[in-house]
Amino acid sequence: MTASGAISISVGVTYVNSSGGVLALTLANAGTAGTIKIITMTTAGNNAVITPANFSAGTTLTMSAVGHTATLLFNGTAWDVLSVGAGSTLTAIA
């Protein structure tokens, strides 16, 4: 992805390129529990802020450098974090 918008839930892996500016990305709920989504930053320059519709681990996930990766699992209600690569940050629910 090179522009702000919705991350596809129909493909397993999304590659993020923020060299053109800050990205505001959304992630809708998956239709099926057990869906796994991997998001990885392949080209950096700016932050990519990901806001899932329902996120059990916080409110947003921010990536800012090449290699930042998150693996998420949809539990039927919300996205759970299976793993977050070094440097990626979660914003806790206030």
Feature map (PLM): residue ranges:
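Exposed extracellular interaction/assembly regions and N-terminal maturation sites
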Residues: 1-52, 74-94
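Extracellular beta-sheet repeat scaffolds used for adhesion and glycan interaction
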Residues: 53-61
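Glycine-rich loops and low-complexity Gly/Arg-rich segments
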Residues: 41, 61-65
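Extracellular disulfide-bonded cysteine-rich modules/repeats
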Residues: 66-76
